[in-house]
């Protein structure tokens, strides 16, 4: 009997949604989506237990010394240099257009999907349905993205059930959520489509556009290594990525930088756990901007350090003329 009950439960968890999820009418009103479209989407969606299992084990729960080696690897650096070389013209144009460094764009695509090779195998509709209506911790966010997916699929003329992405519903080379896809994806090669799945030119332009819209500051380092001395570190640390302190506050507490900042500079003290104890950094505006892509400070630091490693390795390579397919008439 127990086995039969278990089998029935598993079938229920993977079965197509038969009951309209609660709050659908309110969601339709909030997101300005016809209720009938949300109902049709929900009727095609399936509840996926593997999505709930995966989101309960985020990589960002690891300490820094275990998280960093997942992303800062010789292979990812080498392939980042190769990606940069193959798309040098597009990356140069993105830099000029959006004032966002090529190294950052490459690092984002490298961490998110290993330069487009690992874009996710989960049906996006199912993932967002599962998390939007069966994951109370962040149901509001994912329900909104479920509605945004319906709008996006209609606008781009995509079949809802064929879209694949991450367990959290992120899509394409840059892993954009549906709302980000709608607002920040760009047609960077001028072919009339915003294709972040198979078109690296659009993916590069879209990542750059995202950071420009979130106020990336050209030439400003995201973080600075800090010396803490006798500073009361425990009273200065906090979990949120927002820049809730000023450099004057940290300096008064005893924090030191190689080059002090202006006293009113917004900052945040970070502690990253190494195997032999914490290392300390002072985060600045651009670090916060990276956390708009992913709120985890570990993610933001991995992006920054990978971008620096790729940039250093790229500078050592013989420079050749950019590949012709990346050139778009009238864009350079």
Named regions from a protein language model:
Residues 175:
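Functionally critical loop-and-helix segments that line ligand-binding/catalytic clefts
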Residues 1-3, 7-143, 148-164, 169, ...:
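Cell-wall glycan-active module
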């Amino acid at each position: 009997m127990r086995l039969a009950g278990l089998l029935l439960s598993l079938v229920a968890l993977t079965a197509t949604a038969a009951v309209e999820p609660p709050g659908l009418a309110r969601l339709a009103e909030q997101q300005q989506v016809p209720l009938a479209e949300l109902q049709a989407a929900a009727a095609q969606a399936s509840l996926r237990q593997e999505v709930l299992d995966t989101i309960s084990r985020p990589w960002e729960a690891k300490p820094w010394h275990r998280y960093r080696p997942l992303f800062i690897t010789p292979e990812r650096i080498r392939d980042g240099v190769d990606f940069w070389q193959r798309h040098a013209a597009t990356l140069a144009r993105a830099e000029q257009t959006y004032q966002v460094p090529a190294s950052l764009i490459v690092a984002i695509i490298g961490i998110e999907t290993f330069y487009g090779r690992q874009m996710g195998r989960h049906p996006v509709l199912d993932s967002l349905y599962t998390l939007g209506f069966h994951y109370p911790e962040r149901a509001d966010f994912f329900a909104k993205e479920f509605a945004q997916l319906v709008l996006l699929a209609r606008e781009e003329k995509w079949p809802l059930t064929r879209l694949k992405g991450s367990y959290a519903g992120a899509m394409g080379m840059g892993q954009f959520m549906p709302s980000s896809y709608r607002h920040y994806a760009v047609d960077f090669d001028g072919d009339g489509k915003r294709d972040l799945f198979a078109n690296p030119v659009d993916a590069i332009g879209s990542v750059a556009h995202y950071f420009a819209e979130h106020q990336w500051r050209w030439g400003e380092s995201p973080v600075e290594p800090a010396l803490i001395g006798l500073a009361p570190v425990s009273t200065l640390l906090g979990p949120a990525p927002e820049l809730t302190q000023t450099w004057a506050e940290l300096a008064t507490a005893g924090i030191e930088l190689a080059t002090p900042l202006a006293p009113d500079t917004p900052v945040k003290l970070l502690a990253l756990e190494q195997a032999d104890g914490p290392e300390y950094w002072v985060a600045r505006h651009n670090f916060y901007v990276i956390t708009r892509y992913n709120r985890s400070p570990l993610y933001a630091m991995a992006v920054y350090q990978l971008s620096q490693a790729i940039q250093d390795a790229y500078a050592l390579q013989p420079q050749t003329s950019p590949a012709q397919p990346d050139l778009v008439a009238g864009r350079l």
